[in-house]
Amino acid sequence: GLDFMNNGSSNIFINGPISKKHFLKKNYPGITEFVYDKAKQKIAKNPVMLIFNKKLSVSPLTTHIALNNVKKNIVKDRIIENVNIINNFYKKILKIKPNIAVLGLNPHCENNSKDNEEKKAIIPAINQLKKKRIKVHGPFSADTLFIKNNLKKFNVVIGMYHDQVITPFKTIFEFDASNITLGLPFLRISVDHGPNEIMMGKNKSN
C-alpha cells in the first residue's frame, strides 16, 4: 500500500486495525511513525497525529514516544509546525478555520523552574502563531480543559504527550473517531484503535 502511495497513485491511504506487537519492529513506537518513516516525501519534520471527531479532535505533539522522552521533544518549532499543519488541514479539507487549544506540560501549566516548558517553548510558539492570525489559545491545564463548557469552544486540542489528550478523548467519545496522519503528501486514515485479539473471529465486536 505504501509503495502505491509513494508512486503518487493516490492521495489517501486507509488501513484497518493493525497489531503493533505483531507488525512493527522495535524501532517504531507506533503505526503513525512507521507510515511517516516509509513515506518517500515528507511535508513535516515530524509526524502529526490527529485523532479526529467532528465535535472535537485531539493531537499528541510527541505521538507515541515514551514518557521519559517527552520533555526533550517539546520545542517551539515542533509546536508551530504541528499547529500549522492541523490548521491547514481544517481550512483546506474541511473548510473550517479552527479554534485550537494548546495544553501545557506541567500541572497547572507551571513549576518552580524559570526555564520550564511553558515559558521556554509553548508560550513563545503560541505567540508566534497568533501573529499569523491562527486561532490558537493557551497554554491550558489538562485537568480542566476537557469539561463540557470548554469543549464547545474548540475544534482541536493539542497536548504534549499521548495519554494527556487520548485518555480524556476516549472517555468522552470512546472509539467514535478516525486516526489521521498529517505531514505527508497523502492523508493516512485509520480507525483509532488496534485489533481486539480476545474477540477476534467471534463476531462479537460492535
Please identify what each model-predicted range represents.
Residues 1-205:
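Anion-binding alpha/beta catalytic cores of soluble intermediary-metabolism enzymes, centered on
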